[in-house]
Amino acid sequence: MVTSAHRTPAGFAPPSSAGDRSAEVWSALGTVTDPEIDESVTSLEFITSVQIEPGNAVRIEFRLPTYWCAPNFAFLMASDMRDAIAELSWVEKVTVELLDHFSADLINRGVAARQDFRDAFPGETDDDLSAIRKKFLEKAFERRQELLVRYLLRSGYDASWISRASSRELARTQLTDEGIALRRLYVFIWRRIFAGLGEENLAFTTVAGAPLEASELPGYLRKVALVRRNAEFNGAICRGLLAARNSRLAA
């Protein structure tokens, strides 16, 4: 029997009341992204149900834009949802269920058993999800970096300052609400890419760690802008497909 449940149909905002466990779960889910387009599964409206069950258990159901979405991406998102919710101090059990997908059974069983993707699909794939995750993490880094750097340039910070600013200086810089949000997203992924580096290190480098020279910044931004535009294009397609699918299911 479910003692506390919150179901949110596609198109409705998740709960946000302070202290509500459902809101905590939604907040945790908001940190999980579609790896291909670097947008959260909540903003993309993939989540169809969040349930708080007896014994501090959480059950998540989600649906992707098509029945044929790539199973490796679906597996990544499902396992990331599981891990994000499991980090909540009161959660003792997490169940994540992918709905209406051709590989849903294999994905759901594999995520529940904490299997590697190749173990969940024995004999069917050689995909190394760690390599796939790294590839899309690097693309997300470039996308978030470009957005923050362009914001800083619009706000009066010149290319010279950007090329030499340390992470400490970036953290102390006074920004608008927009800038604070962009900085938070960038710093989060910077710490994942450059784990072990400190606040004295350069805030803005290439994904390989090479310094960005002020004179090279315009060309660099043009190059990484292609990553963002591709992600935004894929995101628009994704939303359209999901909206069409939800309309068919609701009919």
Residue ranges and their predicted role:
Residues 1-67, 72-251:
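Domain-level signature for proteins that mediate thiol-based redox and metal-cofactor handling
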